[in-house]
Amino acid sequence: AAPYVIFGAKVPPHWLAIGTILTVVGGIYGPKAFSSPAAAAPAATPAAAPSSEPELDVEKAINDFLASDKKE
């Protein structure tokens, strides 16, 4: 295979493939390897307080819609 010309230098395709693989692997595992263990464990967040709004009951809403549709 013919080499690619990058910034005036001839680069063989296999070097581009190796560089791509190393960049992807380094991007995934690099931050994990260089972070401290304390920073890796996020602080526990408190559970969300229940809101004053009632939760949406989807099944009831669908049944109400179907019932009103049948009346028409």
Curated annotation (Swiss-Prot):
Transport among keywords: yes
Pfam families reported in the protein's UniProt record: ATP19
Quote the subcellular location field of this record: Mitochondrion inner membrane
Q: Which GO terms describe its cellular component?
A: mitochondrial inner membrane; proton-transporting ATP synthase complex
Function, as annotated, reads:
Mitochondrial membrane ATP synthase (F(1)F(0) ATP synthase or Complex V) produces ATP from ADP in the presence of a proton gradient across the membrane which is generated by electron transport complexes of the respiratory chain. F-type ATP synthases consist of two structural domains, F(1) - containing the extramembraneous catalytic core, and F(0) - containing the membrane proton channel, linked together by a central stalk and a peripheral stalk.
State whether it acts alone or in a complex, and with which partners, per the record.
F-type ATP synthases have 2 components, the catalytic core F(1) and the membrane-embedded component F(0), linked together by a central stalk and a peripheral stalk. The central stalk, also called rotor shaft, is often seen as part of F(1). The peripheral stalk is seen as part of F(0). F(0) contains the membrane channel next to the rotor. F-type ATP synthases form dimers but each monomer functions independently in ATP generation.
Q: What is this protein called?
A: ATP synthase subunit L
User: From which source organism is this entry?
Assistant: Pichia angusta (Yeast)
Instruction: Cite the source lineage.
Output: Eukaryota, Fungi, Dikarya, Ascomycota, Saccharomycotina
